Amino acid sequence: MEIWMFTAPFKQGILKELAKCWRDYDGKKYCMGIEKGRGGFRHIQGRIKVSADTNYEIIERIGKRKTRTRKGYRMFDTLSKAGIHCQKTDQWTDYESKDGYYIMSDDTEEVRAQRFGHPTEEQEDVLRLLESNNDREITVWYDETGNVGKSWLTGHLWEKHKAHQVRLTGSAEGIVKDVCSKMDQERRPIVIIDIPRSGKWTPAIYEAIEVIKDGLIDDPRYSAHAMNIRGTKVMVMCNTKPKLDRLSKDRWIFYNAPVGADKG
């Protein structure tokens, strides 16, 4: 197996065109995204994993050349003539997905629909409220009935590399460890705590919210590696009411405030 990095000029429909090429010629795995370089130049950056003996066929298809050469021979030069520059690498990452406009070989139709879909007006309202939060506030999207798009929005923001979803554990330390581990892999501006209908607010959630918003977090599993994430937006999605006295009054900003709480 070989891994290749490639850069291609942007044109309408290029992602689908390249994806079809990778499928037709047995590309084992790929990730490619649209990026904007210096001066606003838009281009495609990607990686593909292929069997060594299929290299020439991929070159011929993308490079639109009819003259055969030995398999894999002068790959860089051939692709360059088609405006596609290629370089062999030993490393596979999904780095090309970082800007949120990308496709991968293991995508399903449902995943792509969520990634490229557009939030509803209500979801946009929630995001505007979240964006207005200061370094102490959290946004709580409370909805007693459900089915208003909270989980869809969580997935959308995750796919666009804008949010991490917290894995709820039985302790505040476990929640903070999870956030620290994910932020260490990739800094994202939003942390989402999605409390399922069968779940409930716990002391661990209140405590973790305060620690995350205060900014300094660490994961003792990795020699107390600490990082400062102050300014990260925190949104809690829930179907049950929180106990408002568990956090300072100035922390709470509600979308669809429950009875007894002031709406942000």
Regions found by a protein language model. Name each.
Residues M1-D26, S51-Y142, K162-L168, D262-K263:
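Catalytic "initiation/cleavage/transfer" segments centered on a nucleophilic residue
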Residues E2, G27-K28, R42, A82, ...:
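Short glycine-/polar-rich loops that comprise or flank the Walker A/P-loop
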Residues D26-G39:
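Short, glycine- and small/hydrophobic-rich beta-strand elements in well-ordered beta-sheets
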Residues V140, I190-D194, V236:
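Structural motif
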Residues E144-V148:
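Walker A (P-loop) phosphate-binding loop of P-loop NTPases
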Residues W152-L153:
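Hydrophobic positions on the alpha1 helix immediately C-terminal to the Walker A/P-loop
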Residues K160-A204:
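AAA+/P-loop NTPase substrate/partner-engagement loops
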